Amino acid sequence: MEFPRVSPESVGVPSQAVLDLLDELYRYGIEMHSFMLLRHGKVFAQGHWKPYNPQTPHAMFSFTKSLTSTAIGFAVQEGLLSLDDRLVDLFPDKLPEEPSENLQKCQVRHLLMMGCGHATEIPNLGQDDPDWIATFLHHPFVYEPGTHFLYNTAGTNLLAAILARKTGQTLTQFLKPRLFEPLGVGDVHCHA
C-alpha cells in the first residue's frame, strides 16, 4: 500500500506548523532519524536525516509490545483465542505442581494490561533460559491478576508465545498479512 502524498494545506495543516514542530524537536534536543506525518490517510510531510533513509532498519525495542497487543487483537477477532483464556489452560505442561490461586486466575487480558500478578519482573528472562515460559509461570503471582500494574516485558513475550502456540506462527509471520503487508512495511523482524 502506498499512501498518497499531498501538501499540508490540502489536509488542513499549515506548512508552518510542520516547520514549527521540527524546530521544537531540534530545540529540545530530540534526535530524529526520520518522520512521516499523515492525516486522512495521506502523507503531508516526511523526512529523513543522514545517514538514515526509508530503507534503514531500526531497532524498535518496546514498540514490539504494541505489535504484540495488535496481534492478540487480530487473533481474538478471528476467534483464535479469547481474552478470558487462562495461562494454566494454555501452558499446562509448564506449570508448577500446585499452581497458586492467582496463577489459576491469570488470563490473556491480564498480560495485556501488565497486571498478571507478579510483584517483580524477572530480569533478562529468556536470554539464557531454554524453558523461560516455565520460569515465568513458576515466578510468584503475589497479587490477584488485574489488581497490580507491573511493567513486564516477559508478559509481552508470553503473549507472543501464546500466539505461536495457538496459530503455529511467529509474531512476525502472523502480522505480515494482517498488518505489515497492508501498510507496505517490508523487511521486519519482531523479537518477542
Language-model segments: residues:
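Catalytic-site signature segments of enzymes, centered on catalytic residues
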Residues: 54-55, 118-192
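A short, well-structured edge-of-sheet supersecondary motif
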Residues: 17, 21-52
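Active-site SXXK
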Residues: 41, 58-84, 111, 159-163
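Second-shell loop/turn segments in exported
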Residues: 6-9, 96-99, 145-146, 161
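Active-site helix/loop module of the DD-peptidase/beta-lactamase fold
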Residues: 59, 78-116, 138, 167-192
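Extracellular/periplasmic catalytic domains that process cell-envelope and extracellular macromolecules
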Residues: 29, 102-105, 128-129, 142
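Aromatic- and histidine-enriched alpha-helix N-cap/loop-to-helix transition segments
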Residues: 61-67, 103-106, 149-157
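Short, compositionally biased leader-like segments
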Residues: 1-14
